[in-house]
């Protein structure tokens, strides 16, 4: 749990975010985007970050005229404000074609 200035404890929950990066980017740019979002979580106070680069996969249907996407899964412990700011960054990034965040129970978290 995080401590605030008032010595109140902020409860951290487990979250899983999966986002799709455009498939036409080169590998260096893709890794730069992944590291950028990982550092955003770290700087925002996320704990126990587990990042899984799932690679390029064929999509079942076209999303923003893309038939392939690069899947990235991130499991982390954080608060609601962190998730809101993280999703806002994903929403306005032109290189991200889709994202989804789920809140997880302690029982469902992936052990790393």
UniProtKB/Swiss-Prot annotation:
Entry GO MF terms: small ribosomal subunit rRNA binding; structural constituent of ribosome
Function: Binds together with bS18 to 16S ribosomal RNA.
GO cellular component: chloroplast; ribonucleoprotein complex; ribosome
Pfam families associated with the record: Ribosomal_S6
Name of this chain's protein: Small ribosomal subunit protein bS6c
Source organism phylogeny: Eukaryota, Rhodophyta, Bangiophyceae, Bangiales, Bangiaceae
Keyword entries, A-Z: Chloroplast, Plastid, Ribonucleoprotein, Ribosomal protein, RNA-binding, rRNA-binding
InterPro entries: Ribosomal_bS6, Ribosomal_bS6_CS, Ribosomal_bS6_sf, Ribosomal_S6_plastid/chlpt, Transl_elong_EF1B/ribsomal_bS6
GO process annotations (BP): translation
Keyword Chloroplast: yes
Compartments, record wording: Plastid, Chloroplast
Source organism of the structure: Porphyra purpurea (Red seaweed)
